Each structure stands twice: as structure tokens, then as C-alpha cells.
Amino acid sequence: MRRRRENTPLRDLRTYGSTRAVRLPDCDYSGDIDIHLTLRADRMAPFKHRDLAQMICKNVEFYCRRLRYTLYGYCLMPDHLHVLLSPAGSGTALSRWLDSFKSYTTHESMKLGRRPPFWQRSGNDHICRAAETAEKVLAYLVENPVRAGLAERWEGWPWTKVLMEI
């Protein structure tokens, strides 16, 4: 175990319980980048309901078209959503896509009888680096239902859509 320096107060070393930045501080997420998003539902497995799953998938595609994002693919699992997209050429920051999508789908979920909050407050995003192509990330993303035992092949999972070759 590492020893702390004698002159450093313990309270200055504490990180648990504090809010951490989930986005890179100097990145506006609106350039020529590919982003893998993972958004978690606030409650257990709401997407097992067909009406809700259809609404979520429809709106992933809608908000990508509306904000001129390139959508490579997505996979909706019972309790979370994976999306691979790129804001390249849209001039719109990722925060706007997230705010619009999460706000609208929360509103629509209330019409379907769900109580807010619908999404967890933050999500995970991962910028695809040079060593990992969007194709590799998409291949990983679509295999989620297979790894979880929900489908034998990714093509058999109704809430997966691929819009690029893998």
C-alpha cells in the first residue's frame, strides 16, 4: 500500500462520493470523431417492453437525422442503450444530441406510463481512437445480446440496427 505524504491532508486525497467529469474537458464532441455512447435506464430493464423499445429505437434514428449526425448503429438492451455515431459535419455538440434525445424519450415514456427519471443522469461516451476503428466498436456493440444470452446471433435481436458494413 502506498503511503500518503505526511503534509497532505486526507480530505485532499478523497475522491469517492465526489462528482467527476464524464466528458473530456477540452473536447466539444462536435468534430470529425466517432463516439460510442452507453446510456443506462434509471430503473431495471424498462426496455423489455416492446412499446418502449420501439419508441427508443425510432428516436435514436430521428435525432441523428434531425441534428445531421452520422449513425453507424445501435443496440438496445433491456436496461441500457449503445449507440455509435459521429457529429462530423453537423456543427452540433454531443451535449445537444444527448439533451434532446433524453428529454424527448423521457417525455414519451411518461405517455407510456413510466415515471421519471427515465435515464440515469450521465452516460458513458468513448471516442474511437486510431487503433480502434468504428467497425471494431460496432462489432462489439452488436454482439451484446449474444453475450447476454438474449439471442443466438445479433441479427436475431430486434433492437439492433447496423447502418455500416462490419
Language model regions located:
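Short catalytic/metal-binding and nucleic-acid-binding patches
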Residues: 1-166
